[in-house]
């Protein structure tokens, strides 16, 4: 009985969560290239295009957004995928002469971006 238990515990110690595999450098790079122009480096809607979209870019470090992130951990990824404001993001970029090359998002990219942004948001005051 001890050997199977030891084997199970050994196997469990090798299993890591998706967060353990997240590439924070990739997440930061994706954010810097694709999000910071509106949300700013600090995620507080301080980017040069933050007030040029309608509605204005939200501050992602507010208590309300932190609660939303806690209640729905996929909110960041779903915002990228679903673009709840229709074509607001591409329209804002186009109207301001910003060209962002197309990006074929991978599962790893979403994981990395989510992990990076969540970390910055949860550390902010």
Model regions and ranges:
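Short, non-ligating residues that shape and space the ligands of small metal-coordination modules
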Residues: 44-45
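Extracytoplasmic electron-transfer domains, predominantly the class I c-type cytochrome c fold
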Residues: 52-118
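Short, solvent-exposed mixed-charge patches
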Residues: 123-125
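Electrostatic cytochrome c docking/interface patches
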Residues: 13-30
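Sec-dependent signal peptide recognition
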Residues: 1-8
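The canonical Cys-X-X-Cys-His
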Residues: 27, 31-41, 113-117
């Amino acid at each position: 009985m001890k050997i199977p238990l030891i084997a199970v515990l050994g196997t469990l110690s090798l299993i890591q969560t998706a967060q353990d595999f997240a590439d924070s450098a990739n997440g930061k790079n994706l954010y810097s290239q694709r999000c910071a122009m509106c949300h700013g480096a600090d995620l507080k809607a301080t980017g040069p295009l933050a007030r040029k979209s309608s509605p204005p870019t939200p501050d992602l470090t507010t208590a309300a957004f932190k609660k939303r992130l806690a209640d729905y951990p996929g909110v960041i990824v779903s915002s990228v995928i679903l673009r709840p404001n229709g074509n607001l993001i591409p329209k804002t970029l186009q109207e301001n002469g910003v060209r962002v090359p197309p990006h074929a998002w991978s599962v790893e990219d979403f994981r990395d971006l989510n992990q990076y942004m969540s970390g910055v948001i949860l550390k902010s005051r």
